[in-house]
Amino acid sequence: MLDKDKAEKALDLAMSQIEKQFGKGAIMRLGNEEALPDIASIPTGSLSLDIALGVGGVPRGRVIEIFGPESSGKTTLALHVISEAQKLGGIAAFVDAEHALDIGYARKLGVKTDDLLVSQPDTGEQALEIAETLVRSGAIDVLVVDSVAALVPKAEIEGDMGDSHMGLQARLMSQALRKLTGIISKSNCCVIFINQIRMKIGVMFGNPETTTGGNALKFYASVRMDIRKIAALKQGNDMIGSRTRVKVVKNKVAPPFKEVEFDILYGEGISKEGDILDLAVERNVVEKSGAWFSYGKERIGQGRENSRLFLKEHPEITAEIREKLVTPQQDAATPGAV
């Protein structure tokens, strides 16, 4: 075994050779200043979900999976992330493998559709090649693939109906993610895969649900969010939206398994004011006495809906409440396994 001085010199030489061959940052000592920078993130449009994710939103330079049943709000959540990225001056891309993107709805959620890059690929291979090229450019801040289930391999499209193509899609996803993860990390781009749920046949015990596209995405994703519609929201006899629960089932950048609930309103998306109101009541920033909601010495409304509308009409009060909710969370991001 080398003595300490010789070992240090040998290590310095080895590290300089590695950096010369593979570039600066290829190897680093974690004790050094700025060895691991703070994890940058993009807000989700829901303050409670940003707090649950631990880093203030979805982390940049990582793979994210949003999965859930049909009409649960998967695309809505992804479009909100795009909207927030654009507000920060970022460029967003949407790979619409399902050929079902509603531009009008995206616009209502605050997406600047004129600046949005949209691709409607014919095959799964084409979709993932486009995604790789965009991420490799280094200019994209967030890229959404909607959805993994619609990434149909070329062989399946060109084959006859009824042909067996066992494991083709899983192999395609595995190969693509092996190539993508490295360049996603270097480019600081947030790549969101939207996924659907399927039922495993013959499962007697445990959860019969699984996601499409094999297991590769489960492993490569730094954050996995399970989104579910838990109740319908009504105003009189009219349906105005749905109460939605999101569970962070995997999180490599903060403690996982946190759950949040918020409203998704039809034609409006995530109810930011409703979300802030619920969180403020939970944290005693807003007081609830019977049906009345009070902030400071001022009553803001009778009933949750009236209070939500008050916050919508008074953005300066909403911003003030939001600031009080965010400030104690600044040191709450506890990085887990990175």
Swiss-Prot record:
GO terms for molecular function: ATP binding; ATP hydrolysis activity; ATP-dependent DNA damage sensor activity; damaged DNA binding; single-stranded DNA binding. It holds the Pfam family RecA. Keywords: ATP-binding, Cytoplasm, DNA damage, DNA recombination, DNA repair, DNA-binding, Nucleotide-binding, SOS response. Its main location: cytoplasm. CDD domains: RecA. It comes from the Bacteria. Can catalyze the hydrolysis of ATP in the presence of single-stranded DNA, the ATP-dependent uptake of single-stranded DNA by duplex DNA, and the ATP-dependent hybridization of homologous single-stranded DNAs. It interacts with LexA causing its activation and leading to its autocatalytic cleavage. Belongs to the RecA family. HAMAP family: RecA (MF_00268). This is Protein RecA. It comes from Geobacter sp. (strain M21). The gene is recA.
